[in-house]
Amino acid sequence: TAEPDYQKIFSTRVYVENKPMTYDVDLTGFPAERDMSMIEPVVKGSTTQDIYQAYLELMSPIQDKMHKMDDSINQTTDLAQRVALAKEAIKLQEEMRHQTSLFIQQHTTSLVAFDLLLESFSSLPTPYTSQQIDEMMGWLKNDWSSSAQYPMLQMQAEMAKHTAIGNHYIDGTVVNPE
């Protein structure tokens, strides 16, 4: 069989719980082309999904600014202006990381917080210091250390430290995220 065209596959993160739930979606809203708009599905009956939806709503204004910033950077040909816009984009990324960190700290028992922390350790280079990574792991330790998933988070955190700010990586050291 042929490999599927992953650009045309609809996907969304849904937190499913073992209880009655509904998943309302408008099939005409599924994007058939990359730039088509999509009507977001509505999941009801999952407390975890509600927490994730609250996170998305918190991040939405910042992400909207990021999308506009990315468009501006891509449309600008003046190098000095692109650099200035890129510096603004870095500040927005820092704001996103800050808001995500606060959200994780406020929802330590939630699977959403666990997933967000796991994602936080996935970027290369890691936008945190080793000390910050240890501190972040401490946020979830009490609630998650006895879970089967926690060793995976620990492993990802240890891998993230290899490219953390201030650590020697391959042939250089990342001093700051800029």
Where are these regions (language model features)?
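Amphipathic alpha-helical repeat scaffolds of TPR domains
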Residues: Q63, H67, T108-S123
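Helix-turn-helix repeat elements of alpha-solenoid scaffolds
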Residues: E88-R97, P127-D134
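Alpha-helical repeat scaffolds
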Residues: T100, T129-K141, N167-G172
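Short solvent-exposed coil/turn linkers within tandem alpha-helical repeat scaffolds
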Residues: Q106-S110, N142-P151
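N-terminal "domain-start" segment that seeds a small globular fold
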Residues: P151-E178
